[in-house]
Each structure stands twice: as C-alpha cells, then as structure tokens.
Amino acid sequence: MFFEDHCEFIEALYCVYYCDIDDDKKLECYKNIYDDYVKFGKINKDFEEIYNDIITGAVYTLDDSNLEFLKKYNGLLLSISDLLRLKIKIHYLDSNPYINKLFGVISHKKNYCCIRCGNNNQNLFYSYKNEDVKIVYCMRCLEFGRVDNFAPMFQINIPVINKKNIIKPSTKLSDLQSEASKQLVINTRNNKNTLVWAVCGAGKTEIVYELVYASVMSNKRICMAIPRKDVVKELYTRFSKDFRGLDINILHGDEKSFVDSNFYIMTTHQLIKYYKYFDIVIIDEVDAFPYSGDECLEEGALSSLVEEDVLVFLSATPSKKIKSYVDDIIKIPIRYHGYLLPVPRIRKVNKKVLIFEEKSEIMNKYISEILNKKRRLLVFVPVIAMCQSLKNYLEKYISESIKIDYVYSEDKDRSEKIFG
C-alpha cells in the first residue's frame, strides 16, 4: 500500500485519475505526464508501478496491517496531497468499503456549499476555468487546505470497538452537578442539543463524566473540543487519571496521538477537519477565543457530527447565538463548594502604577495579604510588554524571595511553565 520515493509525477497521475473528466481526456493526460517523466530523465520505480496499475486498472485488497494503519485517520477529510504525504498508493483504497470519496464543494440549486466548514456564502467561493472545466473552491476554510468541486477528498471510516474494561470515575458530585449530569445524559439520548450554563468553578468537566462513560460503553464516537491547546492537555491528563482503562486520542497543534478508541480530545481547529464522524461533540469554553465569533470553526463543528446527532456546549458566559441554537439549557448558578462567585472590586490608581513606574500602596497591600496567607496569586495584564515590568516591580516592592514567573502566548517555555 505504500511507496518509498515521492515525485511530482505521482501526484499528477492521481490528480488526473480522480478528477471529474472523461476517460479519453484522462488517457491523453496520462500520456503527457509519462512523456514529461521520460524527459525529466530520473527513474522512479514507484511512479512506473503506479502508472502501470492505473493504465491496466489493477485492483488491490488491503490487509489487516493496512487497515490498522489507516484507522488512525478515521473521520478526517484527506486530500490527495495528505495521502501522498503518508506515502500511500491511493488507488489501493478504491475497492475498500470503509473508504469514501467525496467532493469538498458541492452544488445545490445553483448554489455552492462547502462540506467542511458549512460555508454557503457565494461571495466566499472562488472559481476559475481549467480548459473547459469550471473549478470552484471555498475561501473561508482555505487555511486548512483547499477543498473544491474537482479533486475528491477521502474519508476513512474503519470500525473501532471501545474497550469494556473501563473503570467508571468515582468523582463525588454536588447535588446540582448530579442533577445536571443526569439531565445531560437524558437529553443526549433524546437527541437534544444542550447548553450547560455554569459559573466558573461549578465543575463543568465532572458534569460530562457520566455522558462520556455511557457513550464509550455504548461504542459511540465522542469528541471533547476546546479552543485552547493548554486546556486540551489539561483535560487529557484529568480524563486519563479519572477514567482508568480508557484510551484517548489527543490532537492539538503540537501533538497528534491516535489510539484504538472512539474518544477524542482536541482543539476546535482540529475538529473542523472531521466530517460527519462523531455521534456526540462536547465543546468546552464555547465563549473563548479563537472559537467564539469564528463562523468557520463554529459551523465546522456542526459538519463533524453525524446527521441528527448531538452537540453539547459548556460555558460560563454563553452568547445569545449559542442559547438560541440549543434545545435545552441546564443552569448551575453556584460553584461546587456552594459559595457564590467573588464580585470584582474596582480601585482607581494613578496611571503610572499601571506601567509599574510608581509604587502602589493599594496593590502592594492586597498582594501581601494574599501571600501572607500562603495562597497563590495570578495577575493578568493587558499586553505582553507589561509582564517583565510587573515581575520586576513585585521583586522590588514585595519580595525577592518568593517565586515569580510570567507566561504569554508566544513564550517558548509556555508548556513547561504551565504543566511542568
């Protein structure tokens, strides 16, 4: 199923082989590609083998080891280029019932629609002509790779059976958490899209434990998606600890680890790459950047679901759009321990304090009180440049002996500082 030596002529062959043109035109293109290959003058045995297979119509059957390899890419929309990066002889996939070919841009009543991001805004499609063929591609999700009406995408859907020796979490829930957890399971069984609207500290993650366990035991495909990769890592650690025996797929910008399991934790940027694959998608921090307000990510999440299946949102501050979309809202107004949320208090200070050029008695007193109680303190600043200034200020006016550090989005040691 694999080749060793990639060359541009292999990709050209497959682009012609799978494009939507008549057979006579394809034969002419194959000949032109082969002539260019000969002129190039460098022998590539893989190209010649693939060329002969395509010309003669050879058919292959994938063995178990091939299927085991491909299973890692279940649900993803893969382009010809994606498969060639994996060094797969793509025509080997043609006769397999678990692999579908579909076009990323489809036409419905003279309007175009992108199956990946759900775009149906005609102004966000670009078209051009290649000889007599009109090619249309979606511009809204172009950053994730081009999808069009000419070259098909491939979707792998090989059955995965979840392990049954998973130990159910013994996490203790509050009464409100327990009620929310039960209602969420009921709503999911009844195909109701649900918003869990809970304040910060209410324990939203623990509320979905029962749903995750029930879904995994029923061999459902379930995904927990989060906008930020830091939270993906944190949730992976928590679920791995609390669900003993459960294998988990984890996907974010720095890591893609696939295992034989139907449970996934990933960023919302990874979720858009899946198409009609998941039975249940849970989106945490649905109000957070970069998911919130990005129509490509928001509608792409819907495309990842099997039709008529369930979407669950978790948020402390849901938008009107989210609230209007769901069938039911489960509210938890207090935190796990029963205390109300602290109410922010505003203090006016000289603007020089905000750039840490002048000592602030108010800020120093407040920080010192917290540190004297042996508590940890997290301070947010509006711009990255203020991080080092604040660190210098605290060491000068509070204490040089306490451990002070800062982290920001582009910090090369970000993961080590947060999780180390």
Language model feature labels by segment:
Residues 233, 246-260, 403-420:
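Conserved helicase ATPase core of P-loop NTP-dependent helicases/translocases
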Residues 169-192:
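N-terminal pre-P-loop "Q-motif" helix
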Residues 197-205, 215, 220-235, 360-394:
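Conserved strand-helix element at the start of the C-terminal RecA-like helicase core
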Residues 377-420:
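Conserved helicase/translocase motor-coupling segment
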Residues 75-79, 92, 100-160:
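Interdomain "pre-motor" coupling segment immediately N-terminal to P-loop NTPase/helicase cores
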Residues 1-108:
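N-terminal alpha-helical interaction blocks
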